[in-house]
Amino acid sequence: MIKEIYTELDFLLAPVYLVLIYLFAKSIQGKRIKDNPLYSYYARGMLFKLVASIVVCIIFLYYYRGGDNIGYFWSAEFCAKMMTLNPKVYFAVLFNERTHENLSVFYNSNLCCPDYWKDSQSFTIVRICSLFIWPSLNNFIAASMLFAWISYGGIFRLFLLFNKLFPGMEKKFAIAILYMPSVIFWGSAILKDTVTFSCACWLTWSVYNIFIVPNNLRTNILIAVVASFLLISIKPYIFVAFLPGLTLWIVYFRIMKIKTAFIRILVGPAIIITGIGLATFLFSTFNESLGEYGSVDKAINKAVVTKNDLTREAYGKNSFDIGQLDGSVGGMLSKFPVAVMAGLFRPFLWDATNPVMLFSALENSFLLLMFLKV
């Protein structure tokens, strides 16, 4: 499968797509930089993502000899071929009608079977990727670059938003959002992280323009709905983790808009209650869609199962253990400090067992030093 997923044409077309997309980015930068000097970072950030997408492809093709991004593209090819054979079935599958009848059409067309068919979250990436098969000329690296290109819009919006909220820190935000190696590496390939990170950025941007500084409401409501839908469809726990933070953000700005301290004290509790009510309403509305993350008990159980899976012997030294989870809220809270440390700053240098992990450890060491400095 690895040998069939790419040809010499991939490496011939990659520079062509790189140049075309970069020139398009330079064109956008040239048009908008006069109105917003922050666009001076636009083309460079795009170039970083495009190069990262190529690097990710090479690493998964030649170092790991496989990976989800290859599986997603492989399955998306089947879906794209179905477009020419039976457009009705293709569009049904595109809108997530993964029925036995539709699968049988793939089988009877010698396209059996797309991977991840039974995994709704993973198959969402396959469905999205199928839209890029024709524009990429059925080219793995080119499709990855198009994925990176489309995802960049939300990321750059987050960069603009943070600079609006905290002016004078554009270089630091550029490093953190546009140039950080792990961010562009895992956010520039045909992967769940590419879509969910971009959606999280778009959701942050749209919430700001809906609730905090209302602007172009129809467009931003549509963006918020689409971003939320994709987050829930791919990684619902991100939406669950995002919701409290967004609620606090909205409540904080609403309270701070009240200039009189006395009125702020009087009205503040009502705004807080309204915010909690809104978060509760949204959580209950999406409860069924959140599945294993639709309640605290389900989320804890999912965390225990995932943790036990990731510490299996099959992973060897490529994982680290934060200790036993007993499935209780108290037990989860007791692991909070070590889990945060592991999530933000591991692997440490002494955890590295291969070149890729060493690169990640070097970046994490830099982040830890910056954290301690601040």
Question: For the regions a protein language model found, what residue spans apply to each?
Answer:
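Short acidic/glycine- and proline-prone juxtamembrane loop motifs at membrane-interface regions
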Residues: A189-T196
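Extracytoplasmic catalytic/substrate-binding loops of multi-pass membrane glycan-assembly enzymes
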Residues: F60-S75, T84-Y107, Y116-I128, L333-P337, ...
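Membrane-interface alpha helices of multi-pass inner-membrane proteins
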Residues: I184-F185, T219-F242
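Alpha-helical transmembrane segments and terminal signal-anchor/GPI-anchor hydrophobic tails
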Residues: I232-L362
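Membrane-interface transmembrane helices that cradle and orient dolichyl/undecaprenyl
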Residues: F166, L203-T219
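Membrane-interface anchor segments at the N-terminal boundary of transmembrane helices
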Residues: M1-V16, P269, R346-V374
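Juxtamembrane segments of multi-pass membrane glycosylation machinery
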Residues: I2, L103-L146, F345-P355
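Transmembrane-helix motifs of polytopic, lipid-linked glycan transferases
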Residues: L20-I28, L131, A142-L165, L369-K373
